[in-house]
Amino acid sequence: MAQRGKAVKTSVRKFKINDLDQVLGMAEKYASWDATATKADIGEFYSSSPEFFFVAEADKKILGFVCGRESNPPAETLNKWKSRKVASIETLAVDKDYRRHGIATSLLSALFEAFKQKKIDLVTLSVPVVEIAAMKMYGKLGFEPRAQFLWKRLDS
């Protein structure tokens, strides 16, 4: 376990298929999805956008991962957004014992560089409202709120 605020020596690299089990374990524990992650989910992220899938590791242990995907909004949406190419952050997870050590920021920096190489000029993401720390981090990185996703149960 890392001490809070103390730097952790990590390296960020592209995901490799032999990372699957460690990434799956991390996704099951820490990713904010409505359904439990499966090997098929992680495999699909990799097969659809391998250039946008990164892991952070220290001593051969994966401490976090991020995967993104190029989006294809209609031309009208691109015009409204004043954008040429859009991508989304599909998921980001960091082991809870290693949070607040810059790992998420390092992962996102690698992802943003990969996006820039593909001439992507706008990045979107969804964050559950309960993920307050994530919202703060994204705000510090320059993300701005654009919409809110709401729901109401009709069965009660």
Predicted feature locations:
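A short beta-loop-alpha structural element at the N-terminal edge
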Residues: 9-23
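Helix-loop element at the rim of GNAT/NAT acetyltransferase active sites that forms part
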Residues: 24-37
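Active-site rim helix/loop that mediates acceptor-substrate recognition in acyltransferases
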Residues: 34-55, 67
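Conserved beta-strand in the GNAT
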Residues: 55, 61-70, 88, 93
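Conserved acetyl-CoA-binding loop-helix of GNAT-fold acetyltransferases
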Residues: 94, 100-113, 136-140
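Conserved active-site alpha-helix within GNAT-family acetyltransferase domains
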Residues: 105, 117, 129-147
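Conserved GNAT acetyl-CoA-binding A-motif
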Residues: 115-127
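Conserved beta-strand-loop-alpha-helix junction that forms the acyl-donor binding cleft
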Residues: 124-134, 151-155
